[in-house]
């Protein structure tokens, strides 16, 4: 994607409300309020086009749910001197979903600020739609406002989070699963993909997966005691739902999917704040109350 952009990359974020007019995320990256409306509608023509021209009218608009329209409310700018600009934009958008509003999406990327695109000649403007599919399992937040405090959290952690995604395939899978799970059209596949991410992080072997994964997750998230035991039992029950989904037995509910999203979100947040993906040895030492040093 970076090949399309010689200069700055502007990612248009939807479903987010910035509290400040603009905010410096560090490393030259900024986010600021903007407005643009991205739309796409299916239209049918009834005659072939002449050479090097368009289909002649009349045209008819197609009805249905496949049209797309969204308001872009924030312009995330990744400067030209940064490598992997699109990957950085994806990481920050993932953190906006994780920490502020799970409905946040990168609707489009452009090579100019969205406020000035209307004045850029057509042959110079590049606008590429990105996340345009409907969300089949939409997650939402009671508050979609990106406060200064929540943006400070992203500022403090996006560089290390991007490095973890680049270095650890299991963490990259977890980030992808929680980011794309809402767009998967099959509920069983959502549940299986979320658990695949958890297993990649917490399964040292294929033996006794249910107990091992649930015990390691609980020991990672809770100190020894009653809360760790209670969490292990809850996670083990969720794992049963994963198994039924994987074997085509729809004995799970929407709440089970939501609970698994929240479990993975909690794990990812802990990894981000620790700036470290735990090794299998560290997890097993933690399980038995040993020092990881």
Regions found by a protein language model. Give the residues of each.
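Charged, non-catalytic interaction/linker regions at domain boundaries
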Residues: 1-189, 266-293
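Short runs of predominantly hydrophobic/aromatic residues within well-ordered alpha helices
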Residues: 171-174, 187-194, 198, 210, ...
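Short alpha-helical scaffolding segments that buttress acidic/His motifs in well-ordered protein cores
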Residues: 174-181, 195-198, 217, 242
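Composition- and surface-driven signal marking solvent-exposed, interaction-prone regions
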Residues: 177, 194, 210-214, 251, ...
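Generic structural signal for hydrophobic core residues of well-folded globular domains
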Residues: 181, 185, 198-205, 220-221, ...
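Residue-level recognition of alpha-helical structural elements
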Residues: 186-190, 209, 227-231, 253-257
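Flexible secondary-structure boundary motifs
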Residues: 192-229
